[in-house]
Each structure stands twice: as C-alpha cells, then as structure tokens.
Amino acid sequence: MDRQISTGLSLLYDIMDIMEKLLGEGDYYDYGRILSYHAPWMFVIGARGLGKTYGAKKLVIGDWIKKRWQFIYLRRTAEEQKNKGTWFADIAEQYPELEFRVSGNQAECHWLDDRDATKDKHGKTRPTWHIMGYFIALSQAGQVKSVAYPKVRTIVFDEIFPDNMRYLGGEVTALEEFYNTVDRWNDRVRVIMCSNAVTLANPYFSAFNINLKPQLDNHTQYQRYCDGFIIVELADYGGFSAKVAASKF
C-alpha cells in the first residue's frame, strides 16, 4: 500500500513539474468550479506558479466590489505576514477604478472617482477608505476571539502545507476555533487552503481522517470528505484548460 501511495504522489509531482513549465505569467487559477461544490473548507493543491494566490485575490476583491464582502488573508505566523504591504502589487492595475493600501493589519481601498468622498471643514475632498480585508497570523488568532467579523465571507490560508513541515502546536484546533470565531456558526464563511505540495502525513488529514490514496490512484481532481464539509482538489489532474483562466488581462 505504501508503495502504491508513493507511486501516486510521484505521478502527481511529475504532473506538477510539467504544469510549472506550461504556466505563463498571465495565467491564474479560477476558483469557480471548486466553489460550485459549496464545501465550507477547500484544499487546493497544485503546481507552484498556478496562480492560486492571484486567483484568490481576484475572488475576494470581486466579492467586495459586488457585495461588500470582506476577507481574511491567513498565514501561519506573523513572520509569514511581513510582506503584506505588497499584497496588492501584482493585481492593483486590474482595478483602475480603485486605489488600494495596507494599513496596519487591514486591506483597504477607495474609489478614485471620489463617489463616496467627504469634505473636511475646509471644504477639501477626502477619500473614504473602506476595509476590504484583514491580515492575521494563526499563531496570534487567539487574540481576536472577541472581535466580530460579520462581513467576512472568505478566509484564504496560504501555504497550508509548509515546505519545512513545521506546523503550530495544536494547529488544526486553532484553525477550527478561529473559523468559529469568524463565522459565529452562521454557515457564512468559506476557507480556501492553498498549497504547492501535499504530504499525506499532515495534521489536517489526520484530524479529519482524510485518506487521499483513492483520489491519487484514480487521478481524481475533486473529492469530497467529511460529508461534504471538506473538498480536496488536486488541481494538476484537471488539465491546463480546466483550471486556468485565459489571462489576467
């Protein structure tokens, strides 16, 4: 059995290598299909350069524009959030009607046409900055248990399976508690967990009794687990055209 699992993972990694060579700078992952399964927790595993993070940004920015939904960009530690100031750098030009900024732990924007601007006491126009999302480290999530996030629709947990295999102590429980803090049992929040690689020995699959072997053996792109609460996508099994949108531009 171990040999069969090893063979399945080896094939998956071979496909990932091919995908990395095929992907161009203008390609990005489209979350439309996996969202159609309506699973609250989604694991998206695919080649580096697939555009998973870019696609997630496009999704949550679109959610704010259309419905004013907010997001949380989650990383494991505060150290992993140190580059949050550049979070909008690769996507800002796609939204010429908006100006973006990161203020503290908040992602913010305002309309460049000043449609909802205000005037100060001197009559000068002041842009109205809106909170689009929050940058939070899971290691510090216990500090926000009393904070309400009623407008958050999506949590994006980037690099859920770290290359160095270093997880937090009690990490799965911490994520479950954080999810409940944000969702407040309203069944409103969805969690997108992205990874460039997968190892079967990880605390998440162990906690939820996820056996990936049949999915690997059958080259199945999407598979539900835990009565549909969780879905795992092995994105590289879908073929280039199945999961990559035409272009950023």
Question: Over which residues does each language-model region extend?
Answer:
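Phosphate/NTP-binding elements of NTP-utilizing enzymes
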Residues: D2-F249
